[in-house]
């Protein structure tokens, strides 16, 4: 029986697992039932299972043969604070939470690969199956690393995969170098002197200073970053005042910036600091600037050459050369798998969730993972393990 036929038999199981996880979404560091479900499945496959890294993380270990080669495969588990608007039977049962980024599918594909590999054992070495919490803005990968992930599971390399709605169903996209941008937040607090709206001359208007600052911030990329280097700075929140006839004392601005190099990241941070200081001084406004006040920023997701070559070989074996884009445009989105790639060589790859006009973008209340790609993704994981570790002697 061929690999694809075997995975097709697993397909119905993976669909059941995926839709179960979709019905019961759990957000960052609260994935207790999700982790238990995954751990129970891994144990039933005969894997050694460790729980608790990164609070709710799960790692399954499968060793075959006598080789000391090791590979780690990672899937994320967490959902988002989004109210699902789908009406199908497996829609979210948790109000205000849903799997709008496909992490239910990522977990199901990795579980399918774990089951197949545990039953067929056609490799020589050790596979670590990492199920990570809190990818969505809470840096769960970093927390697992801090808790000793790679000390306890000393892999040679680490690999990740994410569904992508803009790619045709079951095709892949991967390349060496930057795949996802770095991500940093900032918060600016401007403090002036409150006054009656009819008497602005008696106060210092923090709203006026904030307006000038917002406009100036948009010059950072357009007039300071080399046009050949992609970057974006966005103001995403403005908080000030509570009534019609008073100029408030305080304005709070929040935003993000994203790019693909440390040099550009440093330049943006420096220019932000410069603008905040000088514009607010010019308006006689006090100001503070804080970077990443709630969570760690994410580094660039950067694929290393040898590991990308392995991922590319596996993807081509699954989808054919015509089914693999080897020069995709990097995404301005961000991914905390980047923390793992700072610790170990590895590769992050996209699998197509479907590019038709009926497919939803990620983080959309109508999104649903495409179950058609479950067997394709699991097959990619299996091929990657067999290529990287080789057959047992």
Feature roles, as predicted:
Residues 2-99, 108-123:
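Acidic/His- and Gly-rich active-site-bordering loop/insert found
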Residues 21, 60, 73, 103, ...:
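Divalent metal-coordination and catalytic microenvironments
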Residues 24, 201-208, 263-269:
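Active-site pocket-shaping loop/turn-to-helix segments
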Residues 26, 76-78, 134, 164, ...:
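Active-site beta-loop-alpha junctions enriched in small/polar residues
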Residues 59, 80-82, 86-98, 104-105, ...:
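Histidine/acidic-residue-rich, glycine-tolerant segments that coordinate divalent metal ions
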Residues 72-74, 186-188, 348-353:
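Non-cysteine beta-strand/loop elements that form the S-adenosyl-L-methionine
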Residues 211-393:
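Metal-dependent amide/peptide-bond hydrolase catalytic core
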């Amino acid at each position: 029986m061929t690999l694809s036929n075997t995975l097709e038999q697993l397909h119905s199981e993976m669909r059941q697992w995926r839709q179960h996880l979709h019905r019961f979404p759990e957000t960052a560091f609260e994935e207790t039932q999700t982790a238990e479900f995954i751990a129970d499945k891994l144990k039933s496959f005969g894997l050694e299972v460790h729980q608790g890294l990164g609070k709710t993380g799960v790692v399954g270990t499968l060793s075959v043969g006598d080789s000391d080669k090791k590979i780690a495969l990672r899937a994320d588990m967490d959902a988002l604070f989004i109210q699902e608007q789908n009406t199908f039977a497996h829609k979210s049962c948790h109000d205000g939470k849903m799997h709008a980024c496909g992490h239910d599918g990522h977990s199901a594909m990795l579980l399918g690969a774990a089951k197949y590999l545990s039953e067929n054992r056609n490799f020589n070495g050790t596979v670590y199956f990492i199920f990570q919490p809190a990818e969505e803005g809470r840096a769960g990968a970093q927390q697992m690393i801090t808790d000793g992930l790679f000390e306890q599971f000393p892999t040679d390399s680490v690999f990740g995969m994410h569904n992508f709605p803009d790619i045709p169903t079951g095709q892949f996209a991967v390349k060496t170098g930057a795949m996802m941008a770095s991500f940093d937040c900032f918060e600016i607090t401007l403090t002036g002197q409150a006054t009656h709206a009819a008497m602005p001359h008696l106060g210092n208007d923090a709203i006026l200073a904030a307006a000038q600052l917002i406009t100036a911030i948009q010059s950072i990329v357009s007039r300071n970053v080399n046009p050949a280097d992609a970057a974006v700075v966005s103001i995403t929140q403005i908080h000030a005042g509570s009534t019609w006839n008073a100029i408030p004392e305080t304005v709070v601005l929040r935003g993000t910036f994203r790019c693909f190099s440390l040099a550009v990241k440093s330049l943006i941070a420096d220019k932000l600091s410069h603008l905040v200081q000088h514009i607010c001084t010019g308006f006689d406004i006090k100001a503070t600037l804080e970077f990443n006040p709630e969570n760690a920023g994410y580094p660039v997701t950067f694929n290393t050459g040898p590991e990308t070559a392995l991922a590319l070989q596996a993807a081509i074996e699954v989808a054919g050369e015509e089914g693999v884009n080897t020069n995709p445009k990097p995404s301005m989105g961000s991914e905390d798998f980047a923390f793992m790639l700072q610790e170990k060589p590895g590769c992050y790859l996209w699998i197509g969730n479907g590019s038709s006009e009926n497919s939803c973008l990620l983080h959309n209340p109508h999104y649903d993972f495409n179950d058609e790609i479950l067997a394709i993704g699991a097959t990619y994981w299996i091929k990657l393990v067999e290529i990287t570790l080789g057959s047992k002697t």
